[in-house]
Amino acid sequence: MPAQASTTFTGADFAWPNSPGVGHLGLYIEDDISHTRLMSTVRTQTGQLCTTLDDSACANQSVRTYSILPRCETDAQKDCVESLGATTSQGAVSEGAFSRYFPESGLADFEGSPGRNIPTGAAPSIFTLPGVPHNDGNEYMVIASVNGVAPVDGVQTPSSITIHASVYPVKVLAGNFMRNTPLENGFGVSHRSSDKWGNCASIADGYCAARQDFPANTKFSLSLRLSTPPKGWLHGRIFSPTVTYEAAGSSTRLKVDATPVQVAAVATWGKYSELPEAAKSGAMNCSDTSNCGQMNPQSSGAHISVEGWRSVYGDQASWVRGQWMYQTLSEYELVGSSLAACTSGPAKFDGFITTNATGYAAGPPVFDPVGKTLSYVVAAPHTNAEGGLIVGTYDLMMRSDLAACLYGGNVSDIVASVAVVYDNATSTTTEVKTDVTNDGTWFKVSASGFHYSMPTIKTTLASKSGALPSVNSAPSIIKKSVSARALATRAQLVVSRGDVVSLRVSKAWTKKCTVVRQTLRITKTGTCRVTVRVETRKQKPRFRTMTLQVVK
């Protein structure tokens, strides 16, 4: 029998406080949990709900779909949840067993269309992990979804698709719960439960799958089979992820192994006239005589609000709870990215950013081409609700060739240093742990153990061999040859008396240019790539790779 709502975590454990009254402005920042409220739907662009893709209202319309993925039942099935597993700190591996859908079916489930690249919409899945108990059982809910837009009789394009996946430890509770109902018109839902439902990962009639605590020191693994793999960037609420991205027949298998993180929420109210100016920013039509409501900033606005309201909520979290979640960054969050010159746009999977910060900067890190630094701003309360310090985590994972392009060097040669900076001062906290790896495919940076206010995580790229960033020179007229010292000058390398300058051209470029007695000789017009090396007695050798456009 399911437990009664009074015997385990309920919505009251994470309740948004009521407004004190007129003239008060509220701030509520918690992870976007709309996926625990929504159900699979297909709608017109104006929000009209359809029962199927062939519904008369949708048949000749551009449609917007939200598909919660079913579990994979065959090897050929696409757009489905393939597996859930876990590994304990002792190395014990537990493979999850599918138990059931919860609810048994959604109120607006629909059959997908492989020809239009629209996945089938089902209900969330519950798996059991017998070897990995949480605080109240061994059931875990998986909510993996794909949503996007398909034009009239057209294919749902990769650029319109958002992929989301989350795992929750759950305990099914009996109570006065009713399934959320999709609005007939619009894009929201109607919440009909009379018991508090705020902590429900999903709701069935009479029951709530209430979120519980993750077991400590346990890594979870979720594998999805997708017809449209993620493009661009993912961001998430996990720590130390390992990503497997491979072909699985005509699908792509996306497998993410990672540890859950503890994320702080802020839920507070303040009298408008007494709020600091930074807290009032973004409030619309608010005064001491109006019902101001609450602000729910996401993405770029969240870290600014965490900082601006810090004196109001006393630098203390309203609550902290475990999260295991990732999703694709939207096109909006990628607009104006400083990485655009080196990223692949919608063509490839570029990277993954994760943090347990309450608020963080939208999009991928900001790149400074002069200092070769990648900066990412994070913000959270300093302490949890009990007064304990909140410990920060951050991971940056990107393709190695992307890191090499940003620095201007070879894929296998890129290294980095990591610093946690507070108001332009680097943290000296001994507990801060950093790690940088580059296996030639993925370049990974990790930082943990830092404390919050609103620090910037700075990753400074460098060359393992000492090579300086490459230089793309303007088209040059080179009649027959150019000396090593002349190229060193062009590469902005200082050469002193007694220094030895040498040149190297890799085999891939020898049809265009060669090195003869430390002189670059041009054999064909076009592009030539050459590495200039300056050796001195008192310093390490300096390198720089140049890409030249030459005219014979």
Where are these regions (language model features)?
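Proteolytic cleavage junctions
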Residues: 428-473
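Extracytoplasmic soluble-region selector
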Residues: 468-552
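Generic recognition of long tandem-repeat/solenoid scaffolds
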Residues: 367-391, 438-452, 495, 519-522
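Hydrophobic beta-strand residues in large extracellular and virion-surface proteins
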Residues: 142-144, 161-165, 220-224, 241, ...
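Proteolytic-maturation and junctional protease-sensitive modules
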Residues: 392-444, 504
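Hydrophobic core
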Residues: 1-2
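Long, leucine/valine-rich, helix-dominated scaffolding and oligomerization segments
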Residues: 5-354, 364
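Proteolytic processing hotspots in large secreted/extracellular or virion-associated proteins
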Residues: 356-415
